[in-house]
Amino acid sequence: MLCLGIESSCDETGLALVRDGKLVAEKLASQVDVHAVFGGVVPEIASREHLRVLPVLLRELLKEQRLTIDDIDVVSVARGPGLQGCLLMGLSFAKGLVLSCGAKLVGVNHLWAHLTAAGLEQDLQFPSLGLLVSGGHTHIYLIESPLQFTLLGRTLDDAAGEAFDKTAKSLNLPYPGGKLVDDLGRQGVVNKKLFPVPYINNDNLDFSFSGLKTAVANYVNQNSNLRLDTMGIPEEGVEEPAISEERKNMLASFNYTVGRTLEVKVERALKRNRGVKSLIVAGGVAANSVVRSVMTDVAAKFSIPLVLPSMHLCTDNGAMIAYAGYLMASAGCRHDLDLDAIPRGRVIPSDWICEG
């Protein structure tokens, strides 16, 4: 079975081919440079970029593999959550391909795909506990199969990735700033009391990072010397050493606070779900070194394996959509051409059609 995956939920255009569960090839076009001047993603521009790039990537992908669209058995596409216009670009493109070549159409939950992406590199054991940490979502799932996810905890306001983005922006770090927050923080010294660990004094598994965002903003406002004068990293020797170290220490403390928050909630979830066979951590923030280190320790504490996708599978990509589509199609699931795009904030229904 050859499955084409299409990812267009935000500002990455990704296409990939998975054959019988193995990644054959992939293409990814990033829009980082396009949106950097605005300091964030502009939905209209992102949609137009998807429209422009999708056919180009498909031609390149098929040509390099010496394939045609008639060789494709399944077209899987991210149906949500995401930016409505961006999702519609991918969905319309997928439907056009299905009409052209007669392949099956499978709509993929973008969030679930992040968590099952590690299956491209190793066998997944179920049931598993899944932690999804991204720009828009911080969720904990009980995963009983690739098609059965139970949401145990979710972000109530701002996700962890949003806190990273706003922290970077408050310091005038270049967009996207998540990696710089990690890299600079690794050079600093942690002050565990600098920022409050948010929303842990309760008995639930939900997250709230709005308070941490506010605490960071207040700290930067009180210490305006932390901000770079312009959006960018200054040349070597421009900064005063003390200011540079203070910034690194602040970011080290911020990284610690996010990691500690995730640690508390995941440990609580594992105590309530003792039967899980592994801990899966995915999403863009899963590339953060502190998050990876903390989750390694948590998994060891509960004597279960930690499943972390490779760095390139943590961020949005076509491979995770292709693999999730392959899993669904292998289980006999598909969608009709009336498949809808589901933007962020709405529940994605399990409305697939099962055959056999």
Swiss-Prot record:
Main location: cytoplasm
Gene Ontology BP annotations: tRNA threonylcarbamoyladenosine modification
PANTHER family: TRNA N6-ADENOSINE THREONYLCARBAMOYLTRANSFERASE, TRNA N6-ADENOSINE THREONYLCARBAMOYLTRANSFERASE, MITOCHONDRIAL
Cofactor: Fe(2+)
Species of origin: Maridesulfovibrio salexigens (strain ATCC 14822 / DSM 2638 / NCIMB 8403 / VKM B-1763) (Desulfovibrio salexigens)
Reactions the enzyme catalyzes: L-threonylcarbamoyladenylate + adenosine(37) in tRNA = N(6)-L-threonylcarbamoyladenosine(37) in tRNA + AMP + H(+)
Name of protein: tRNA N6-adenosine threonylcarbamoyltransferase
Recorded family membership: Belongs to the KAE1 / TsaD family.
